[in-house]
């Protein structure tokens, strides 16, 4: 990819995302454009300090491992139980198509994120894991599925 972003909250950062340009292809006046459109936080160096620490000694990857492994377990369970994954995402985010009765039943116990209506009777929902997701929480969700 020419550009992508790295989320911080999945690994415990207070807030923020890092935009990464991979081929020395940062658009001309990129920082100025961000400032002019209100997308640059005051005291943004605090955000940078988090990522500086997270990118040292592979800390980001070490912390993210839990979120990604938890998401992988949930993806496997969804497939095994016949759910349709909307697309494959090798991250801590899972996008799954569900009917409304299933969503209603699950939302009595867990928080799902609405993504979009797939059709008249199905909705694409988002399930996220994080550095703090426990194996017990994953087991509970799998049982609910």
Language model features with spans:
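Conserved C-terminal alpha-helix-loop-beta "cap" of PLP-dependent enzymes
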Residues: 72, 77-145
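Active-site C-terminal subdomain of aminotransferase-like
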Residues: 1-91
């Amino acid at each position: 990819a020419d550009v992508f972003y790295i989320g911080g909250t999945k690994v415990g950062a207070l807030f923020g995302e890092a935009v990464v340009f991979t081929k020395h292809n940062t658009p001309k006046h990129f920082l100025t454009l961000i400032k002019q459109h209100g997308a640059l936080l005051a005291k943004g160096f605090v955000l940078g300090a988090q990522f500086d620490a997270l990118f040292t000694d592979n800390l980001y990857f070490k912390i993210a491992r839990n979120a990604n492994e938890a998401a992988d377990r949930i993806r496997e369970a969804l497939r095994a139980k016949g759910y349709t994954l909307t697309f494959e995402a090798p991250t801590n985010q899972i996008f799954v198509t569900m009917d409304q009765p299933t969503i209603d039943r699950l939302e009595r116990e867990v928080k799902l994120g609405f993504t979009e209506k797939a059709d008249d009777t199905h909705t694409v929902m988002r399930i996220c894991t994080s550095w703090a997701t426990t194996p017990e929480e994953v087991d509970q969700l799998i049982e609910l599925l």
